[in-house]
Structure formats: C-alpha cells, structure tokens
Amino acid sequence: MKRSTSSAKAVVIGAALVGSVPAFAQSSVTLYGIVDNGLAYQSSSTSLGSTSGGHSVVKMTPGVWAGSRFGLKGGEDLGGGTKAIFQLESGLNSGTGAAQYTNALFGRLAYVGVTNASYGTFTAGRQYASYYQLLSPYSPTTWITGFYGAHPGDIDGLDTIYRANNTLEYTSPKLYGLTVSGSYSLGGVAGSVNQGSTWTGAVQYAMGPIGLAVGFSRINNSTAGGGAWGSDSTTTNGGSQVGVSALTNGYQTARAQQRFAVGGGYTFNSAWDVTATYSNVQYIPGINSKFTDTAIFNTGGVVLHWKPAVVWDFAAGYSYTRATRANGITDSASYQQFNLSQYYSLSKRTGLYALEAYQRANGKTLGTNGAGQIIDATASIGDGFNSTPASSASQFAFGLGIIHRF
C-alpha cells in the first residue's frame, strides 16, 4: 500500500513539474551558401581612371554567375501568425578563400525583424533597400548576371552590390498583387539626420504573367557638402563608395546620388519570358564636389529568357546608357552593352554556365579630377569590371564556370 501511494505521489509531482515548464515557440535555423568559380577572359583591362595601357587578361574569377557566400537564416514562431526572422550572410572569394569584406564578418547581410502575413515585414540591420527588393525580379542580373550583365557599372543599383547599413525597412503584405515597401538608413552623423543617410521606396504589382515595379532611392554622402565619400555613409562597400566605375569615376565627390527606376516583365509560357527596365540616375554636387553640374544618366534595357528544356536556360540582353551634357562636356558619354548567357543544370543545386558580353562607349566623361579633366569614355562591362575597365572604347568578356548551391 505504501509503495502504491508513493508511486501515485511521484506521478502527480512529475505531472506538475512538466506542466510548469514553459512552452517554447518552434524555431529553425538554416545554413546555406553558394560556391561559384569560373575562368574569364577580358579583351582590355587597366586600372580605374586610366585611358591607356590596357591589355587582355585570362584569369580565374569567383562569383561570375553569383557571388560566393555562406549564411544563416531562421525564424521563431511568436504566435498569432507572427514570426521573428533573421539573416546573417558573409561573402568570400572562393578562388582564394579570402573574406569579401575585411572589416565586416557578415558584410553581405546582417538583420533581424518580425513578419506577419496580415501586417507585413519589418527588419533592421545591414540589408538591401526597398528600391532593390521590389525591382530585382525585373533586373537584367537574373539571367545575364550582375558580373557581366548589370547595366554598365551597375549605374542604377539593380544588382546586389548596393547594401545599406543601419537600415529600417518595412514591406507590406501582398494585396491583390500589390506590394509596397520603404526603407530608411540612419547616417549617424552628429547634428544631422540627412548626412550619410539612405532612403528608398518602391511599389510592385505582380499578378499572373505580368509584373511591374517602380522605385526611388536617395543616397547621401556623410561628408558635408560633398567631397571624399565619408566612412559614415550608410551605403558602403567595405567602407568605400559603392559602384564607382569608369562611368562615374569623375563624380565620386557627389553630395548625393539619386535613382529612379521602372521595371516590368511578362511570362509568355513555361519556355519564354521577357523583362525590361528604365532608370534615371543623378549625381548631385555640393560645394566641395569636384564638379558643378548634376550628372544625369538615363538607361534602358531588355532581357529575353528562353528555357527549351528542364536543364537548359538561354538569355540575351541589350542596354543603352546615355549621360547628359554637363560640366563642360558637349559630346556626352554613351554606352551600348550586349549580353548572352547559357546555363546547364547538372542538378537542382549545381550548374555549368557560359557568359559573353560586349560593350561600346562613345563621347566624353570626367576623369578622377572631376570637371578639370575631360577624357574619352571607356568601356566597363557589367559591374564585375568596375575596377578593371577597358583603356579604350570597347571591351569584350567571356566566362565559363561552375556553381553549387547548398
């Protein structure tokens, strides 16, 4: 009898202890990544700002189709349809093993937030701004890659190189095909809410075979009145200005960069789809800038994608960029770019690819010294050649590679 009573007490106590343990929400963490290595040929390569001394080059180039990376992402169910989310992503040179950013462990992405299907998503940290998030489905980089296929120098920020620090971002739930998003990146400059800040907004409509988006962004230099790009500027590439290329080298000292873009796409059937974009980009001077007139670049582009079989993808793209006459330039620069891509899927995660690109530049632009240095415009394919443009008006590039996603 005593033994039976003791057993009963043990069961009761055990049940009480179990009942007193809080019910923790379900959570998950996923490790993911991309390793991409290729062999690339470039017909002319020189240092940024040079218009002579270019030579052809063949080299191993990582991240030609997609930047090599690894990351962690996950979430926790908070109840009521709300989840906490986070993402940490680090870039790397898969040819050498070196980190993409020497001063940032998770230089690609580092944010945390909450999401709810009825109320939308709010995130805080280093991330892509709303401008890119909603325009990216119609970006040329989807099928002809940013390395070769971004509009010259990624002039309009439609590739993934533009990330902003200290960003607060809200994206609405999709309602009747419509999504709205806005982001603000705090510059953190004492005495100013404007210096170094980045703010963007975008609207997207996607329903059935049709997709459309429009976006605007304003990137402010943290250096008052323009000048050398301040380290406190929220939109940075390892602490330096993003997207400096042969197109924009003479406008690095801008007080602000302003972008407006429209993109759209149409899916004809399972084999064919097309996307198109237009952008207006302005480099706005300040009292300390090395140029005096706003530099404006208008770009239009189109990409046709064909999938004849499950394992094959082919794409062709064309873009035209033209600068306005300003800062003493009467023959303004223009850039025509042609792209082809071929992708063969070995599996859902692994593929082989080939890429070809040609760009032709015409007219004049500013050199490193700004308005005091008018030079011939030189070619700079996509954004993979921002630091190694051609020394002449034309440039051809060809790449072969393998990519694996995990």
Regions found by a protein language model. Name each.
Residues L346, S392-F406:
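Outer-membrane beta-barrel "beta-signal"
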Residues A202-S345, E356-Y358, A393:
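Detector for outer-membrane/organellar transmembrane beta-barrel domains
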Residues M1-V11:
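Bacterial N-terminal signal peptides that target proteins for export
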Residues G49-T51, T102-L105, P140-T145, W229-T235, ...:
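Flexible, surface-exposed loop regions and adjacent strand-edge segments
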Residues L39-S47, L92-A98, S130-L134, G188-S192, ...:
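Gram-negative outer-membrane beta-barrel proteins
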Residues S27-Y41, V58-G187, Q195-S197, G201-R218, ...:
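Outer membrane beta-barrel
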Residues V57-T61, G95-T102, I155-L158, G188-S192, ...:
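Outer-membrane beta-barrel domain signature
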Residues S20-P22:
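N-terminal signal peptide c-region/cleavage motif recognized by signal peptidases
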